[in-house]
UniProtKB/Swiss-Prot annotation:
GO-annotated molecular function: ATP binding; ATP-dependent protein folding chaperone; isomerase activity
Subunit structure: Forms a cylinder of 14 subunits composed of two heptameric rings stacked back-to-back. Interacts with the co-chaperonin GroES.
Protein known as: Chaperonin GroEL
InterPro entries, per the entry: Cpn60/GroEL, Cpn60/GroEL/TCP-1, GROEL-like_equatorial_sf, TCP-1-like_intermed_sf
Length: 120
């Protein structure tokens, strides 16, 4: 029964990550799986589940704080292109995304559709 709860938790983490950030579901899933695995191992070894939960919550707060401190605003077209290129693994896609964002502005919407036509 615990494995099913863990699987549901991991699934929910991936969904929430996708809803909030639109990216990072693989990282979130790997972290959630590790937390569930190690959490179950610690509880089986006699750890107090509530203490474990509080420890995880404190760790999440600290990690969030650290990430927010190191976060950088992405403002220029060049920064957008560089960030998008890293995410896509392709500089030309990064440039294309930066160009699209430059045209629609910060509040604009960009829709990406899959095409069956190669090269278009």
């Amino acid at each position: 029964p615990y494995e099913k709860i863990g699987a549901e938790l991991v699934k929910e983490v991936a969904k929430k990550t996708d809803d909030v950030a639109g990216d990072g579901t693989t990282t979130a899933t790997v972290l959630a799986q590790a937390l569930v695995k190690e959490g179950l191992r610690n509880v089986a070894a006699g750890a107090n589940p509530l203490s474990l939960k509080r420890g995880i919550e404190k760790a999440v707060e600290k990690v969030t704080e650290t990430l927010l401190k190191s976060a950088k605003e992405v403002e220029t077209k060049e920064q957008i292109a560089a960030t998008a290129a890293i995410s896509a693994g392709d500089q030309s896609i990064g440039d294309l995304i930066a160009e699209a964002m430059d045209k629609v502005g910060n509040e604009g919407v960009i829709t990406v559709e899959e095409s069956n036509t190669f090269g278009l």
